Amino acid sequence: NRIRVSGSFDTPVFSTALYHQSTFNDLFVKGLSVTAGLRLEYEKMSMNYFSDSNIDFDFFLKMAMPPLNIPFRNLNAAPLLEGKEKNDYVQLLPKLAFKYDFSPANNMYVSITRGYRSGGYNVQMFSELIQSDMQQKMIEAILDKAPESMAGMIEGMIKQHMPNYGKELNVQETTVYKPEYSWNYEVGSHLSLFNGKLKTDLAAFYMDTHDQQIAKFVNSGLGRMMVNAGSSESYGVEASFLASINKNLNMNVSYGYTHSTFKKYDGGTTSSEEQIDYSGNYVPFVPRHTMNAGANYSFFFDKSNWMQSLTLGMSYTGAGKIYWTEKNNVSQSFYGTLNGRISLQTKALQIDVWGRNLTNKDYTTFYFETMHRGFEQKSRPLQLGVDIRYHF
């Protein structure tokens, strides 16, 4: 049998902001610039919700000792959730950056910014709420129909097997997730060396995040929800190098390291009422290492030739280790893929022959758990293809 559940949700968002940024050049010494900015943002959001259902059912109370078989027929439960949630937030997001140009193409910088990510509503949680309300209404219908002498016994049995029975549904607590805030600190340098033949970007960063938003599956496994996971910190380094050896050959290498962990994350309780604490665990879906290395060699031909250029390119891309869960019990180790491309350019036509994952590397690109089972999305195997572009 099917049970009809209706739902109507309206989630308007209004936001407005004032922003100012000023840069002061050659402050105190030549080449030193200071940038200061401030963003004032107001965001107002609301959710008008209506969800209801209706079910006719029969209930049979059966016991072996003493022998008991009492039918409760023609019962009805009509769960209803209707109302409005309103939330508004005011943010001050400052920015301060120092940059020193020690030559026209080389500089060092330090920046401090405050980041913000909007909150919202987990509308999909209403499927859980309406189910809970339906259970409550069905139990109330049974108790209303039961003889007064048996109502207490039945209610006691229900509470024994359903500890959440009688608890008031809290729509706001269940559906609302708060904004995420972060303080971001970065120091780095942009360098152009050997007459521009080598360009380098170097950076080190630290992020202090509060009310971090994490996506997770709901208890029923039917849908995902956003939750605020306490606080986390991330720090790391990034480096990239682009070398133009000559007009034919260029090479690039980049590397990033990120250490991202929860400082505080209360994961609730288990079925046995044990506290779950993920503090100190790695933040899921954040690769510890990322890297890329590539080279392109181009052959250039006379403009009178029908073929203007032919470029051969190879690249290697890697990432890992990546944790998939807050428990840190499932992960993907470091992996890398080899890719290649041959590009033919004429005056009006470009033909690219490419290959991805040339070594047919097997790895996991995504993982999630629902209904006590784990599911993973595997990588794409070796791929070959051709792209054709015609310019007119």
Per-range role (PLM):
Residues 2-9, 21, 78-85, 171-176, ...:
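Extracellular loop and loop/strand-boundary signature of outer-membrane beta-barrel proteins
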Residues 1-103, 121, 163-170:
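Signature of Gram-negative outer-membrane beta-barrel scaffolds
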Residues 116, 315-325, 343-392:
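C-terminal beta-signal and adjacent terminal beta-strands/loops
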Residues 29-34, 105-108, 195-200, 248-251, ...:
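Repeated loop/turn-to-beta-strand initiation elements of outer-membrane beta-barrel proteins
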Residues 107-111, 130-227, 233-235, 256:
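Membrane-embedded beta-barrel scaffold of Gram-negative outer-membrane proteins
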Residues 10-18, 38-48, 88-94, 112-116, ...:
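Transmembrane beta-barrel architecture of outer-membrane proteins
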Residues 28, 197-210, 225-325, 389-391:
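Gram-negative outer-membrane beta-barrel transporters
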Residues 20-26, 90, 98-102, 114, ...:
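Residue-level signature of outer-membrane beta-barrel architecture
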